[in-house]
From Swiss-Prot:
Belongs to the class-II aminoacyl-tRNA synthetase family. Type 1 subfamily. Its EC number is 6.1.1.23. L-aspartate binds at residues 187, 233, 461, 502. One of its GO terms (molecular function) is aspartate-tRNA ligase activity. Homodimer. PANTHER family: ASPARTATE--TRNA LIGASE, MITOCHONDRIAL, ASPARTYL/LYSYL-TRNA SYNTHETASE. GO terms for cellular component: cytoplasm. This is Aspartate--tRNA(Asp/Asn) ligase. It catalyses: tRNA(Asx) + L-aspartate + ATP = L-aspartyl-tRNA(Asx) + AMP + diphosphate. PROSITE patterns: AA_TRNA_LIGASE_II. It is found in: Cytoplasm. Residues 211-214 are annotated as: Aspartate. ATP binds at residues 233-235, 495, 547-550.
Amino acid sequence: MYRAEESMMPLENRFRTDYCGLLGVGSENRSVRLGGWVHRKRDHGGLIFIDLRDHTGVCQLVIQPEQQALFNAVEHLHAESVICIEGTVVLRSSETVNTRLASGEIEVVVSSVIIESDAQPLPFPVADEVPTSEELRLKYRFIDLRREKIHENIIFRSRLTAMVRRYLEEREFIEIQTPILTSSSPEGARDFLVPSRLHPGKFYALPQAPQQFKQLLMVSGFPRYFQIAPCFRDEDARADRSPGEFYQIDMEMAFIEQNDLFEILEGMFKHLTENMSQKRITQFPFPRISYREVMNRFGSDKPDLRIPLEIQDVTSLFVNSSFKVFASNTKEGTCVKALVLKGRGGESRMFYDKAEKRARELGSAGLAYIQFREEGPKGPIVKFLGEAEMEVLKEQLGLETGDVVFFGAGKWESTCKIMGGMRIYFADLFDLDKDELSFCWIVDFPMYEYNEEAKKIDFSHNPFSMPQGEMEALETMQPLDILAYQYDIVCNGIELSSGAIRNHRPDIMYRAFEIAGYTKEEVDSRFGHMIDAFKLGAPPHGGIAPGLDRMVMILRDEQNIREVIAFPMNQQAQDLMMSAPSEVMAQQLKELHLKIDLPPVKEAK
């Protein structure tokens, strides 16, 4: 149970003078009033013991047999009933001390009790963490939140949020709330739309992020902005993403360069980690890895650096190879990649079959490998390779007897991603330290990419990022060679946030969009309000917005984002407790000038 600060004391009133979890040695012989929930109740031959719980912890109450009126009052109490008691704190005998409780050296002999709320039988127990379906937990979330682990998660989240605020305020950030009702943007995820009663046929949108507002705050002359910002996106749920609503630590700064922002963020994560957890940051300052390098080495722009495996490029070894599958993938834009598992060359056939199955799931046509055994190399491609090739391969990759090497070949990006997926697949072979936090920055993202379907140049990520080299780069370089001032912060394979140094120059913005096929008129139509603001004096600026929910997940070792949110939706974007979304009254629709046009009901097969 969450342990409150020792200095934390309740308001003294008729309900309580003390908290359950703060009583201990030194409290003996004191008269106290306590209020809370009946965590457990036990009848031991006339003595009734009640474990009373509040948000600070549990303490044991004793009702003695001679107190017949009290005995009768509590005898039939259900678990989770709310009571207020008066009594005297006494020390427990040495043989009855409970070392699992902070208050385990004392108990309270009850002299009076008031039953504030006699609970009905519960849909699932609070005191015992028995497996319970998520559907039931979300329907009765107010009961679920009483359970120790999730209760601690929510208190932890509150304390972390307060620490973030203090950290940023000490560095002259100004907390500013931006609008919740704003205009719809067709880019990105789907918007949640809100119809306007006063303007029939028109809609507000809930913000997917305060992106444009925070940039306009920089134009307004505020040097450093932040808020714990609610964001709304109509997208599907994942284990690390809540449908509908999430919170981010939204930040923007004027007159900064990329490294200035990195320094602020690294300091904040270090401060939170050291003060809120027992975890360790493996490298500080956080390593900076370019997009090209991270894909080559780890096959992902969200690498888990704890995994002691790196992808190696062996393209040059197979330029003149007799193995045509590899030789044909040594030209520009293609590659041959290798992943070495030390000491795993003697694994069973099932091990390799499962690995190949995973590779196919990732999009590969198969999975080539070579086992280096005492009797010599084994594997499906050994017969295609000469002895000299094998020796060069062993030397370059540092291969020894007992090792196995896996290969991928094809287009550079897809091959990197497949091998990166295999790297994660093989991570289960290693005992990764869950208390290590391996942060890194991914930098130097490409500004543009080629859209194979549309046969045109598109923006790779954020179209409002400043290109590295600014206008000169746009005028003199090939689009696919231009890099952007974009960056991601990643921890243990989880992307916490993307950010960028913004493009605050209208002339550069028009040219950047022109390369991606947009006319000046199209840019003005979509983003005119931003460009107009930038024409009236905009400072260089940049920002980032780490996910609050994901940060709590990492520090609390939670795999599911719903474990760190007080009232989350389920994976179908439903609030089971409040029965949302729900139908509304016809009069409400009429006031909004709306009619419902439902899709036809699909017949069950």
